[in-house]
Amino acid sequence: DQPRSRGLGDVYKRQEQDGNQPFLMCCHFKATHEPYDYPIRMEHLYDGVTFPEPENLLDWGPETNGRSFKGQTLEELERRWRIASQDPDKWWCRYPGLPFSTEGMQRTAARRASYQKFIRDYLRCGATVDDNIGKLLNALDEMNIADNTIVIYVSDQGYFLGEHGFFDKRMFYEESARMPFVIRYPKKVPAGKRLDDLILNVDFAPTLAEFAGVKMENVQGDSFVSNLEGNTPTDWRKEIYYRYWTNHAIRPAHFAIRSDRYKLIFYYARNLDMTDTENFDFTPSWDFYDLQNDPHENHNAYNDPKYAPVIKQMKKDLLRLRKETGDTDEKYPEMQELLEKYYNK
């Protein structure tokens, strides 16, 4: 509630001073981030509701789908709830709805119970954000500036809501990698349009600059104003590059490439000179997904021979993107050796 009230106060004040001057307001909501703490007015929202489960909620890791890593599962979140239930002062944050424990439950029942608590807390936070965004939009209507104001709702990443049994983010699965981006600008953007082009967050700044009539040079991203207007350039990117540096056993360091249909990930699992890492035994490995035939990424198809030509080309494209972005790890001889050793494994 606080980001909305402060943001509205600034807008009202600016409009009273000079309603003809342009303004920029950034209103940052953190509510759906752990610990998923919602305001008191939402504490009974969804009481008694049993939420539908993701089809792969009971994904138990490499044994289930052949992926290369365990992942940050709901069992870890339940462990945090349990510690905080016993002594809240021993944990870094305050979770709502405690005490909570799955002690004594079978593995499947415990995960399902943890999911129901997690998604209920999360959606209560989401409802709070939604409520406040509605108030912001209503304020623009009241000031008669809605049609001349660009409104964007965006996040810094996606989030796992029980898919693969996960919570949190970080990994290059669709739920985590896909960022919400919703824009309202009646003058330029048709309502109800959905864009399937590959967009990166480095594209946001040049896009906003073009809307504002500002020319930007020497930037990494590309404006997608034309895409939003229904005129995607013929030379628009066909692949995107991703890297996650922090290295832990449940979420090893990796880099990846994604096209409109395929995804290839290399888990190198080395600390390099990063902080917040740990040492563990892990053999570097590849994961590959066909997003058309396996949209929920339930089967690592890296060793399926029918995909060998696709994987071979994607590895070449991955090296090209690493070079284009300047992310070649030249200062890490260890990484050069790893790539050479595992490139064709």
What annotation goes with each model-predicted range?
Residues 27, 46, 227-228, 257, ...:
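A generic structural signal for nonpolar/aromatic side chains embedded in well-ordered alpha-helices
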Residues 1-12:
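Single conserved hydrophobic/aromatic residue that forms the stacking wall/gate
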Residues 314-318:
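Short amphipathic alpha-helical coiled-coil/interface segments
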Residues 22, 157-163, 202-205, 210-287, ...:
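C-terminal cap/loop subdomain of S1 sulfatases and analogous C-terminal strand-loop tails that border
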Residues 14-21, 26-199, 210-219, 273-275, ...:
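Active-site-proximal cap/lid insertion segments
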